[in-house]
C-alpha cells in the first residue's frame, strides 16, 4: 500500500494564493506603463493629424488671407477626427486653432495646434492637461518640459513642437 505522502503532489491552497498575489502585484505594476505606451501611440496618430491640419490651414490662409471657417474647406479632406479624440474647431475662424481632446481615456489631456501664420504662438502644438489631474500632467511631461506658468491654476501645458 502506498503511503499518503506519495499521493499528494498538488499545490496547497496557500501556495496558490501566494502565486495569485504575486501575479496581481506584477500586473498592477505593469498596467500604467502599458497604458502610457498605448496612449503614446495614439498621440502619434493625433500629432500626424495636427501637423497636416496646421499645414492645410497655413495654405488656406496664404491663398485667402483669412482663416477657414470650417475644416471642410481645407485641401486635405479631413473628414474625421482621429479615433479616441474629440476635435473642436471653435477658434478655427479667428485663430486657425485646432483643439483635440482625449475622450474616454485612462487620463485627460488635449492637443492644441496653431498654424504658422497665427499671430499667437505660431506653428506650435501643445499638450494640455488640467492641474487637477495628476495622470494627465505626467503624460504631458512625457513630451517635454512645462511651458505654462506655475501660477496658472487651471492648465498645465507642454510644448510638443
Regions found by a protein language model. Name each.
Residues 28, 32, 36-74:
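Conserved hydrophobic/amphipathic alpha-helical signal-anchor segments
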Amino acid at each position: 500500500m502506498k503511503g499518503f505522502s506519495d499521493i499528494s503532489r498538488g499545490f496547497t491552497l496557500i501556495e496558490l494564493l501566494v502565486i495569485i498575489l504575486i501575479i496581481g502585484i506584477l500586473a498592477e505594476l505593469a498596467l500604467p506603463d502599458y497604458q502610457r505606451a498605448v496612449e503614446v501611440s495614439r498621440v502619434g496618430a493625433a500629432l500626424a493629424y495636427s501637423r497636416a491640419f496646421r499645414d492645410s490651414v497655413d495654405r488656406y490662409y496664404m491663398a485667402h488671407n483669412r482663416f477657414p471657417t470650417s475644416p471642410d474647406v481645407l485641401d486635405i479632406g479631413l473628414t474625421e477626427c482621429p479615433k479616441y479624440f474629440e476635435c473642436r474647431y471653435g477658434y478655427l475662424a479667428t485663430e486657425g486653432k485646432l483643439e483635440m481632446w482625449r475622450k474616454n481615456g485612462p487620463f485627460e489631456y488635449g492637443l492644441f495646434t496653431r498654424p504658422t501664420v497665427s499671430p499667437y504662438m505660431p506653428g506650435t502644438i501643445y499638450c494640455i492637461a488640467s492641474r487637477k489631474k495628476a495622470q494627465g500632467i505626467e503624460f504631458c511631461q512625457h513630451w517635454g518640459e512645462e511651458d505654462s506658468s506655475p501660477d496658472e491654476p487651471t492648465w498645465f501645458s507642454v510644448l510638443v513642437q
